[in-house]
Design a protein with these regions (language model features):
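A short glycine-rich, hydrophobically flanked beta-strand micro-motif that places a catalytic Asp/Glu
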Residues: 22, 26, 31-46, 282-283, ...
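Structured beta-strand/loop patches that form or line metal/cofactor-binding pockets in enzymes
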Residues: 13-17, 26-36, 287-293
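Domain-scale recognition of functional cores that engage charged ligands
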Residues: 45-47, 60-66, 71-330
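Low-complexity, highly charged intrinsically disordered N-terminal segments
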Residues: 1-24, 80
Length: 330
């Protein structure tokens, strides 16, 4: 599906900012800019006994500490067998970082991790990745995005207050959405394009992950593989004869999602800051529900291969109030 988007120049349909297309094409064609990790959100079809793809979080997926550490600790603290859980997320992250380091052995294995300030949950997610990178042989550091300096000719730097010097890094992991950079930080998008193309910087996740972060990829998949048992019908326009879910192309945590009944009435919706974006309409599929009325959605982490499972519990639309739920395989 990603190749189809690139070959057919569907970037605008995907909602991808024009100023990121050059970097997307470049990183797509160069295997040294490998994808680090993503999370697939899935629903389970109990009748047909297979899963349905809800969406893919390819750029800035979270729930790392809950999946890698918390649910594993729950097993250990209760004296349960840790092998009764599908969870090798940390080990796979270490291996993937090591692979990326080897792909880029012409660069210094130094990586700076960054988030937006005042989002402590993002900082916790990044701490998991920092430990994995450290175990993979990287020198690691952290700085908020407003503390990072970018030079179009020299690279990426962090100020070291201890000796009043600037430290250069050849790798940068940002838990900051690519589309935010493209739309809101246009100068930074231009600088990053130059740095990446001139081998001054490797950015994780790479720019081509926007191909999968955009929910328009669900429409592309349906067009390529209509009625595939793992997919739900997805269209650019509302489906008046079928219950559906309206989603903006780059929304997060359930923001600006609506459930639309047959005939067009909205039965459930969550507000948010992404309302001016284009939408796709995905066939509604009921999530599994417990006796208290909570719904459950599976999150499957992918790091070169599927490697960990966790669940989120909440209402009809899972938003930023959803709770993480661990699992055990009997």
């Amino acid at each position: 599906a990603g190749r189809y988007v690139v070959d057919n120049h569907l970037f605008r349909e995907m909602g991808i900012p024009d100023n990121l297309v050059e970097m997307i094409r470049y990183t797509w064609a160069d295997e040294r800019h490998a994808h680090l990790y993503s999370r697939f959100d899935l629903a389970y079809d109990e009748q047909e006994q297979h899963v349905k793809l809800i969406e893919c979080n390819a750029d800035t997926a979270t729930c790392l500490p809950e999946t890698a550490v918390v649910q594993w600790a729950q097993l250990k603290s209760n004296g349960l067998d840790e092998n009764s859980q599908f969870n090798t997320l940390h080990e796979e992250l270490v291996e993937r970082f090591a692979h990326i380091r080897l792909l880029n052995d012409d660069l210094t294995p130094s990586i700076l991790f960054s988030t937006l300030r005042d989002y402590p949950e993002d900082d916790t997610n990044v701490s998991i990745l920092m430990e994995a990178a450290r175990e993979a042989g990287f020198d690691v550091a952290f700085a908020y995005i407003d503390e990072v300096d970018f030079s179009e000719t020299e690279g990426l730097f962090m100020h070291d207050p201890h000796n009043a010097a600037f430290i250069r890094f050849d790798f940068w992991f940002k838990l900051i959405p690519w589309e935010f950079i493209g739309n809101e930080e246009k100068e930074l998008a231009s600088i990053l394009t130059s740095l990446v193309k001139n081998r001054k910087l490797v950015v994780l996740n790479p720019a081509h992950t926007l191909l999968y972060q955009s929910k328009y990829i669900l429409k592309v998949l349906w067009d390529l593989y209509p009625y595939h048992p793992l997919l739900l019908q997805t269209e650019r326009h509302a489906m008046p004869h079928k219950k559906s879910v309206a989603k903006v192309l780059f929304g997060r945590e359930g923001a600006n999602v609506s459930i639309i009944e047959k005939g067009g009435d909205v039965s459930e919706s969550v507000s948010g800051e992404y309302g001016n974006q284009p939408r796709i309409y995905q066939e509604y599929f009921p999530l599994q529900t417990d006796e208290a009325g909570y719904t459950y959605q599976a999150g499957l982490f992918y790091v070169n291969e599927a490697c960990a499972l966790g669940f989120r519990r909440g209402g009809k639309i899972l938003d930023n109030t959803a709770q993480f739920v661990g699992h055990m395989i009997e």
